[in-house]
Amino acid sequence: MADTKAKIIYTELLKEDLVVIRLVPITGMPKYKTGQFLTIGLPVRAENKIVKRAYSIASHAENRDYFEFVIRWVRKPLPGRVTTELFYLSVGDEVLLGDPTGDDLIIEDKYRNGEPDNRRVVCVGGGTGLAPFIAFAHHFRDTN
């Protein structure tokens, strides 16, 4: 499928290098699975072209209202071209979105015999590698 336009409906700067962004595709929310990622494309002024980068979806698949991303701006050795532009966008601005892709993050909550599996789950991730785990935690909370 081709890229689709999406509007920014929410931004929150958590730290000088960490932002939460929520996007709504203009054509409606596609189906996706918790743990997937998609590409965000923006015109990069310095290069006079659209540049796309992959970002993990931090919202869970049961959320049909928006995509949420937690994005860190790494400036060394060189700042990311798309990430840098994302930090300067505002509510109402538009970006291009690719289709959700990648494997989903599934942890079964039942044994094969149907009995509930009440063991604790430990997820390890660093930096913005936490985004899929945020999605999983929301999914787990809302489905159990």
Question: How would you label these PLM feature ranges?
Answer:
Residues A2-D93:
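Ferredoxin-reductase
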Residues L78-N144:
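FNR/FR-type flavoprotein reductase catalytic core
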